[in-house]
Amino acid sequence: MNYQKFAHVYDQVMDQQLYEEWTDYAVRSFSHSAKRPVRKVMELACGTGEVLMRLDDKGYEVIGVDLSKNMLEIAEKKAQGRSIEWLQADMRVLDDVPTTDAVTLFSDSLCYLTDFEDVVSVFEAVYDHLEEGGIFLFDVHSLYQMQEVFPGYQYHFVEDDFAFLWQSYELDEPGSVEHVIDMYIKQEDGNLFEHFQEVHEEQTFPIEMYEVALEMVGFTNIKVKADFGQSEVQETSPRWFFQAVK
């Protein structure tokens, strides 16, 4: 998903507190679970760079990778004056991307790969780009979130210069949903709003499928938690947080 128009309103509709929680989760995991000192971090599907800039503030050497040119352009503007490397790349392949001590993939970005073979390709690419003892962190929506919460879900966000309407629908494939996003953005003359629509599909697979795939690729010390790694997974946990070590 390239997030064409969505990129321009992404930061305004995202819960900023989540960025703090992802950052804290990453730093805790680097310290407690990696089998090597973590100095260099790569974030896949980095979006507009909010987590990366927080990691940069904490002294990590960081690299941001995203498929969306629009997202990266916004991230680069926000991060002017910082020594952050930004790369446009497909996380299933990661050609010409350096190895790092840690790789993160947050904000349920892995759910946008609806074919499990693509998920495995990401695991393989990450494994190849981690130093020995490096750690891989990612999260996905839980099956409870996908099957019980999202169907029929609506979210509206309105400002003076734009309106954002999000509606979610259950799809036929178990664990899959479609998000229909309508955006009304005020034009420069201030008199008219232009309408854009994007349709995003997400898919979550059972925990065991992720665990087996990680193990087959070669990862060890695989753990799955909820609440940003601070509690055990429950039936109603909204997200699953995975960590795996090379």
What feature does the model see in each segment?
Residues 95-102:
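A short acidic, Gly/Pro-enriched loop at the edge of an enzyme's catalytic core
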Residues 106-108:
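Residues lining the SAM
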Residues 137-209:
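SAM-dependent methyltransferase
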Residues 120-132:
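A short glycine-rich, Lys/Arg-flanked "PGG" loop and its adjoining helix->strand segment in the class I
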Residues 201-246:
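C-terminal lobe and adjacent flexible extensions of AdoMet/dcAdoMet transferase-like proteins
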Residues 1-45:
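Conserved class I S-adenosyl-L-methionine
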Residues 42, 49-93:
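Class I SAM-dependent methyltransferase SAM/SAH-binding core
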